[in-house]
Amino acid sequence: LTASQELPEGCKVTSTENHGISFWAQTGRIDVRLLDGTPQSFFIKVLSKELGMNMTRAEFHSMSAMHNVLPEFVPRPIACGTYRTMADTHFFLCEFREMTDDMPDPHKFAALLSTLHQKSVSPTGKFGFHITTYAGNLPQFVAWEDSWEAFFAKSMRQALDLEIERKGPSEELDVLSRVLFEKVIPRLLRPLESDGRVVKPSLVHGDLWYANAGSDVDSDQPLVFDACCFFAHNECTFSYETLAVTHA
């Protein structure tokens, strides 16, 4: 398999160029001319090794899940795969959408995000996702869980374990984490699923901040990309966006 095999049959590649910025991948634009003479463009992301393969698969499945629910909100994913002549090199391919550098219109953006959360349905009725997704190059906890409290707690535990693995043990972190898991999370989240209350597992982008959103140049339609999805409480990733904007 090669990326060129996933392009429209009979098309001619007219140009390729680097496009976009990524900490983890090479990213580019592919321009082609279709058999009828119509120009068309594609975006490609290339990563290496086993982690790169897992990340390209995760992005394809994430973007496909969002596109299936709300196709106008994301560039159409096309394929992911491994290069035939470079077995350790992997790609994610989607349609190319020219975007402005401005933030999307907040009212249009919020309306689309709300629609995504409301229309999406977890295939298992649980919180999680069917394939491990990655926030940057870090794997997220996505195992299926019946309870939002349980899912969130295990997600936080995995994040803390990764922190300890990278930076070493911390007595202060141990003290804080015990309070977090024994008191804070149960007190804040358990009432959401008590006395008949329920939390709907909604499809969330997973890494929603200003650098992963834009507006289509032609339609001014808000778009999001670089998704690392899972089914969660619909507000769970808003704190990530606020933190990113605050420290930008």
Predicted regions and their residues:
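An alpha-helical support segment within catalytic cores of ATP-dependent transferases
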Residues: T2-L7, T82-T85, V121-H205, D216-S219
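Conserved N-terminal boundary motif of the eukaryotic protein kinase catalytic domain
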Residues: E9-N18
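ATP-binding pocket architecture of kinase catalytic cores
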Residues: E17-A150, K154
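Hydrophobic "anchor" residues on beta-strands that sit immediately upstream
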Residues: S41, F91, P201-L203, P222
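Activation segment
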Residues: M99, P222, C228-F230
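Active-site activation/catalytic loop segments of kinase-like enzymes and analogous catalytic loops
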Residues: L162, C229-A248
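Hydrophobic HxD+1 residue recognition
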Residues: L208
